[in-house]
Amino acid sequence: MLSRDKWFAVVCDAPLVSIDLIVRDARGRVLLGWRRNDPARDCWFVPGGAIRKNETLDQAFARITQTELGQPLLRAAARFRGVYEHFYPTNFAGIPEVGTHYVVLAHELRFDGELVPADDQHSRFSWFEPALALADPKVHAHCKEYLA
């Protein structure tokens, strides 16, 4: 894993490649976490994470689902939803005038397990009916793209 300074240098100079998880339960609700840090601070956002150097997509998917959902899941069990571009005017370090650019590989999956406690990225998780998430101004616009 990169140091904070090296990670910031990457954010300054390159797009990040990440996996977003569009997680649904048996009722069709979508899982969102309340973000506590930039670039999507104070918004509801889907779980996900950046892919690390030399990490295969399958390895990244298993690591990200372990971190976000509490168990490693197989990418083959998810449905690939497409490639998205996310541009933010802010960054994780809060340094002014440095935005964050993500190239996102969105995957949809069903999950009926117990949710893990909140982490340094999210203060809490909640299940949303898709129509209510689309209408909620606190759900980030990038997440609404997945639900429209």
Model-derived features: positions:
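Short, charged/polar surface micro-motifs in flexible loops or helix N-caps
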Residues: 24-30, 38-40, 52, 85-89, ...
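NUDIX/MutT-family hydrolases
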Residues: 106-110, 116-147
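Conserved Nudix-box catalytic region and its N-terminal flanking loop in Nudix hydrolases
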Residues: 29-72
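Compositionally biased, intrinsically disordered linkers/stalks adjacent to structured regions
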Residues: 37, 147-148
